[in-house]
Regions:
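Phosphate-group recognition and catalysis centered on beta-loop-alpha active-site segments
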Residues: 1-122
Length: 122
């Protein structure tokens, strides 16, 4: 399988399937597409899969990802769906090594914490 030709950027998303959602990642795996995703740390240092620094575009909520704990973030829905912001661990379990992942680290303070935590998971 040639995984390098097409990459599902933030998963295989559409009008009905939000980017960086577990459904978008499942669909990419079903189509045997490599996946690019972005990770950030929450206030309580959990690794979530989310592209933007702030929550407005995807969740309609004021504030940055780092301003909230994962428990708080998990109550927010992605766009107009029932999908929530996934943990990296949930995405890794969903993908289960079936397709290549390109993980972009969206780092902020504290510098090095995200890198260390992602490295430990791999």
């Amino acid at each position: 399988m040639d995984f390098g030709k097409y990459i599902a950027h933030r998963g295989l998303h559409s009008e009905l399937v939000p980017e960086n959602s577990l459904t978008a990642f499942r669909l990419a795996v079903e189509k045997c597409l490599s996946i690019e995703l972005d990770v950030r740390l929450t206030k309580d240092c959990r690794i979530v899969v989310f592209h933007d620094n702030d929550l407005m575009r995807m969740c309609g909520i004021e504030g940055k990802v780092f301003d909230y704990t994962y428990e708080q973030l998990s109550a927010f829905k992605l766009k107009n769906s029932d999908e929530k912001i996934p943990l990296l661990s949930e995405v890794l379990k969903t993908v289960d090594g079936k397709v290549p992942l390109l993980i972009e680290l969206k780092d902020g303070a504290p510098f090095g914490e995200l890198e260390s935590r992602v490295d430990h998971m791999m």
